[in-house]
Amino acid sequence: MVIYNPLAGGLFSGKIKSSEIPQEGRYSDQHHIGGLYRTRYFKDATFDALRVIELVAQKHNLTMLEIALRWCTHHSALKMQNGGRDGVIIGVSSLAQLESNLKDLEKGPLPDDVIKALDEAWLITKPTTTNYWQLDLKYTYDTQRALFKPKS
């Protein structure tokens, strides 16, 4: 299993705080998919949920980005430890971002009250969140075997 878009379209970067259309970046009208991104993410519930997380992030001196990446590593359904083959796809625009993201991915589990805030935030945004998967999820083969079958 792989997590794509762990920063919720960049909302966990902390740069976007409201549904006001930015002048630059993926959410702007200058970007060819800006409108699609805004349709997916620019909802009142999304920004309300982010504010819940920001409060606990400040309390623990954590960045929103760090919270997102550490949650993926330690609190999601991913199996990354002890030989697990799951992962997180991260996008970066500089070597410094890559190094910072990798350091955050290597840090330990989040404090309990951060997890509680994330759970609360999910309950706030869940009713208006767009589902990524658009079709029925039906496999006609053993996915584990197809992906991880030992080579002869």
Where are these regions (language model features)?
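Active-site lining segments that contact anionic ligands and/or coordinate catalytic metals
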Residues: 64, 85-87
